[in-house]
Amino acid sequence: MSNSRNIVIVGGGITGVSCLYFLAHHPSFNRDRDTITLFESAGIASAASGKASGFLSLEWHGPSTSSLAALSYNLHKELSDQYDGVNKWGYRALDTWSIKADENCQQPDKLPEGIEWIAPSIVENVTRLGNKKNSGQVHPYKFCHAIYEEASKVANVTLVKGHVLSVDENEVEYRLIGDDYAPDEEEEITSAEELHTIHSMEATHIIVAAGPWTPQLIPNLRISGARIHSITIDLPIKLNGNAVFSEITYKDGTIAAPEFYAREDELYVCGEFDDEPLPELSSDTKVDQDKCALIKQCANHFHQIIRDSPVKVRQACYLPISNATGAPVIGKIGSSIYVAAAHGCWGITLGPGTGKVLSELILDGAVTSANIDLLDPEGSLE
């Protein structure tokens, strides 16, 4: 009887690729015998993990996630040091601020140095929220792709572009999605038939890390998705490491609260959540151009340099949220199914740590690097 492990991961966001990486690098993982199959319907980091701000925080976490956050924050630094994350995925420390602005401001507060994209004349109040010891950032899309590539170098990894339809103990059923087939006519006919066929794959362990789509596979999990829009702006200056949680009062008294994350080569700005229903696939996520325009219009009020700069990217994604606990759901369900989802706005911060603890749970049988007792799936099951 073979003792090989055939591990399936559903979801190619930061949680899925972090699981892949730490499984592949675990000392108990047999690179000659064990396999990992990653199912992703649209591509690595195609949903929220590729469209998030990439903000990292060490301290803004409650009792249920503080231990995991400390582990994960340190892993971000270790991975950056090991693989040149500064250049490969924009890893850097940040200063974090709360800035209250008012276009009718009479007595401006002092604007922190290095934030050239906010007009000093509108700054009513500044509060430091974090510093370079406890705040940071990555470009999440670049991070996910780099970590996936590093895992693929050391493990037998198969990436399947497919829509997983169901998971059961030791088996997944899926339908292929794709255009990755030979172009001749005979192959096209075969491909069309193949794409409508439901396939099955045996697995010794199944990790469901499908974000807000996780309940499609584990229906009694109380997890939903909230859509949020963001844009990036191409400013003609090099941007220092600052995150700004703002509130601005316009001349007419209207109040808005955009969040700004300064990357080296662009300014990331996000707006508010809306109630657009979750589509069946992440690739079906709709971008409301009017909402992106509103984000830019809001940002324009902060400085002329923003008004004069073009938008590079307009995008939307769904953040996975636990309707039961408000915290991530991480752990084992049944004998061979594991779940890692509902990280909300902290998915990028908590991604590597989640991958680490799940690799321990699967290959060691217990988690030792962080305390995740309060994240057990039992608390989120109906």
Curated annotation (Swiss-Prot):
GO terms for biological process: retrograde transport, endosome to Golgi. Its main location: cytoplasm. SUPFAM superfamilies: FAD/NAD(P)-binding domain (SSF51905). It comes from the Eukaryota. It is found in: Cytoplasm; Membrane. Pfam families: DAO. Its EC number is 1.-.-.-. The keyword Transmembrane applies. GO terms for molecular function: oxidoreductase activity. Keywords: Cytoplasm, Membrane, Oxidoreductase, Transmembrane, Transmembrane helix, Transport. GO terms for cellular component: cytoplasm; cytosol; late endosome; membrane. The keyword Transport applies. Belongs to the TDA3 family. Putative oxidoreductase that negatively regulates the retrieval of cargo from late endosomes to the Golgi. This is Putative oxidoreductase C1F5.03c. It comes from Schizosaccharomyces pombe (strain 972 / ATCC 24843) (Fission yeast). The lineage of its organism: Eukaryota, Fungi, Dikarya, Ascomycota, Taphrinomycotina.
